[in-house]
Design a protein with these regions (language model features):
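Serine-dependent acyl-ester chemistry module
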Residues: 1-168
Length: 170
């Protein structure tokens, strides 16, 4: 998700801190010609980085973002603040908005990064869900698949909290 690994995400190398006001101020500053010129000058003077190995290694600072961690919460706050800004802009210009939650593949996509904790890991919940599905207990399997997704420490799929924020804002 962009709030975690995208430009200015809480887990990216290109972050400007976690305070939304500072981030918006820095984005506006980047629009100034002087800032763009200084950035261009810096890139010409700095040695070029080699991206052939793996772009993700360069872009992502914090690859592992555990569920309910400080970075996880910051990503949720950033998502909620960004959504509120966009919705306020649409409201100001009287533009209708249609909402949708984020769909994710629970069954066919194993957790990317499973870490052990006090409770079961993402991999353990995924395996349990597979067993529950085999036993034709689809409700329990759905719950376990959902828990595996939420515990996946590589934040490429929307957690249940993202959809809760969307529902709350709708």
């Amino acid at each position: 998700h962009n709030e975690y690994y995208g430009a200015l995400g809480v887990g990216s190398n290109n972050t400007l801190g976690s305070h939304p006001t500072f981030i918006r101020w820095a984005i506006r500053l980047r629009q100034l010609r002087l800032t763009q010129w200084l950035d261009s000058l810096k890139s010409h003077l700095s040695p070029q980085k080699e991206f052939s190995d793996n772009l993700m290694k360069y872009v992502v600072k914090e690859q592992v973002i555990p569920y309910k961690s400080k970075l996880f919460q910051q990503g949720l706050e950033q998502f909620q603040n960004n959504m509120k800004l966009v919705l306020n802009l649409f409201k100001k210009h009287q533009i209708p908005v249609f909402f949708s939650t984020v769909g994710v593949n629970l069954k066919d996509l194993k957790p990317f990064k499973s870490i052990s904790s006090d409770e079961h890991s993402a991999d353990e919940y995924y395996q349990l869900a597979q067993e529950q599905l085999q036993a034709q207990d689809s409700i329990a399997a759905y719950t376990s698949f959902s828990r595996a997704r939420d515990l996946d420490a590589l934040r490429f799929r929307a957690s249940k909290e993202i959809n809760e924020i969307i529902r709350e804002l709708a």
